């Protein structure tokens, strides 16, 4: 990190984005777009070793697809903390690197090396996001990654 961010503030933001970690219900629209089924199929395919990127204009439902995927995974009895949603356009999270955010997640929420699903919303706000995601795909097979982006992703 360029300067020391308050770890507890970052954890509070992450916990706010992931109410299922505390056993709280999700409020997600029932209508599912075509992209939902395609994302689920790829995430569940053990041979698929890439990140999935949903790109498109704002307000078309990309975030809803991410949250619906989380809801489906949680209904499948995965460990709730193994599913992490991070909105990278949050003012505080924009100050940290994606690597730092995932390190905090692994150190404070869910142990390193265990399988996890990363739901990265508005990924274009993370500096050098392409390199971070490529590194995660290449060196962390325990991660399944679904990211969204707007504008020039």
Mark where each language-model region is:
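Phosphate-binding site recognition
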Residues: 1-153
